[in-house]
């Protein structure tokens, strides 16, 4: 019986960790969806501004925004992986 108690706690901890991980992944997915919508609107704006002489500047801003978004998502993903490994 004494052996079952730590195993049960370990199982409960694992379930909580998986639940927390699932919530974190859902939050990241929601953020990625928001970013995708923003990128879609930015792309739409670029098409609308096609004849605008400032197209090159707008493209540079779009690229900068994409790179910043990508870096932030990679950073968040690495932090999440690191936290998950620490819990194990």
UniProtKB/Swiss-Prot annotation:
GO terms for biological process: apoptotic process; cell division; ectopic germ cell programmed cell death; positive regulation of apoptotic process; positive regulation of developmental process; positive regulation of reproductive process; reciprocal meiotic recombination; spermatogenesis. InterPro entries: Synaptonemal_3 (IPR028145). Keywords: Cell cycle, Cell division, Chromosome, Coiled coil, Meiosis, Nucleus. Disulfide bonds: none annotated. Residues 7-75 form a coiled coil. It holds the Pfam family Synaptonemal_3. One of its GO terms (cellular component) is chromosome. It comes from the Eukaryota. It is found in: Nucleus; Chromosome. Major component of the transverse central element of synaptonemal complexes (SCS), formed between homologous chromosomes during meiotic prophase. Required for the assembly of the central element of the synaptonemal complex during meiosis, via remodeling of SYCP1 lattice structures and promoting recruitment of SYCE2-TEX12 and SYCE1-SIX60S1 complexes. Required for chromosome loading of the central element-specific SCS proteins, and for initiating synapsis between homologous chromosomes. Chromosome loading appears to require SYCP1. Required for fertility and normal testis development. Homodimer. Can form higher-order homooligomers. Interacts with SYCP1 (via tetrameric core); the interaction remodels SYCP1 homotetramers to 2:1 heterotrimers with SYCE3. SYCP1/SYCE3 heterotrimers form lattice assemblies as part of the mature synaptonemal complex via both lateral and head-to-head interactions. Interacts with the SYCE1-SIX6OS1 complex; the interaction recruits the SYCE1-SIX6OS1 complex to the central element of the synaptonemal complex. This is Synaptonemal complex central element protein 3. The lineage of its organism: Eukaryota, Metazoa, Chordata, Craniata, Vertebrata.
